[in-house]
From Swiss-Prot:
Organism: Escherichia coli (strain K12)
Subcellular location: Cell inner membrane
Name of the featured protein: Envelope biogenesis factor ElyC
Recorded GO CC terms: plasma membrane
Membrane topology, as annotated: Multi-pass membrane protein
């Protein structure tokens, strides 16, 4: 119940739903109250914020500092384990396997497989539990997609119980102890994930995937015209900012827990 409540409240505070709530409140004031000026202010703030957060220069300027914490892993250090954190998914056996990994999940898996190929004999670990309306776990879907891309099942470990990053860290500790491993997740999520894993006394090596903030050349109109693509980048900023606030409120500093 607490997990569901956390997800609902957290998602309502993300840019799109929050701005729609503000605009909706403004419309309600305009139509059903005498506070016309306040209603106009609410609508104007919501509209302007949505406009700005849907522009590439604004969205990526906000996202880039989070994503640039760790560089892409190109180190020669060899590891025995590569941990790929779960993300959005569904399971429809009629689809191409990779279509079942939604948004951030497929780039994470692709990077995990790249690193697995660079570390012969290593194990790929997929994490993530079962969604409320699904019978297949995030970890299992990741394993099935990896198999479809040529990774032998015996080289894969699935951790099917964790519901969030904190639980994923605890599950990885139980599975591999303090062995060094590559931690693969979205670049925006990696700073927060590293704190949870280090707090467990683990030895994660950061391997970011799914970088979104663009600083390479784009067409001028792509920078100037609002797009849901850029709004999604702003959404990542909101999501990770809320996650870090929650982490701070829980007292997760990144220092190992005292046994």
């Amino acid at each position: 119940m607490l997990f569901t409540l956390k997800k609902v409240i957290g998602n309502m505070l993300l840019p799109l739903p929050l701005m729609l709530l503000i605009i909706g409140a403004g419309l309600a004031l305009l139509w059903f109250s005498r506070f016309q000026k306040t209603g106009k202010i609410f609508i104007s703030i919501g509209w302007l914020a949505l406009l700005l957060l849907s522009l590439q220069p604004v969205a990526d300027r906000l996202l880039r500092p989070i994503e640039s914490t760790y560089p892409t892993w190109n180190n020669s250090q060899k590891v025995d384990y590569i941990v790929v954190l779960g993300g959005g998914y569904t399971w429809n056996p009629q689809w191409a396997p990779s279509s079942n990994l939604i948004n951030n999940s497929l780039p994470r898996l692709n990077e995990g497989i790249r690193l697995w190929r660079e570390n012969p004999g290593s194990k790929l670990i997929f994490t993530g539990g079962v969604a409320k309306t699904n019978t297949v776990s995030t970890a299992e879907v990741g394993a099935r997609v990896a198999q479809s891309l040529g990774v032998p099942r015996e080289q894969i470990i699935t951790l099917d119980l964790p519901k969030d990053t904190e639980e994923e860290a605890a599950a990885v500790k139980q599975a591999i102890g303090d062995a060094p491993f590559l931690l693969v997740t979205s670049a925006s999520h990696l700073p927060r994930a590293m704190i949870f894993f280090q707090q467990e006394g683990l030895n994660p090596l950061p391997a970011p995937a799914n970088q979104l903030a663009i600083d390479s050349p784009l067409n001028p109109w792509e920078r100037a015209i609002p797009s849901p693509v850029w709004l999604m980048h702003s959404d990542r900023v909101g999501y990770e900012t809320l996650g870090r606030i929650w982490q701070w409120l829980k007292g997760s500093s990144g220092e190992p827990r005292q046994e």
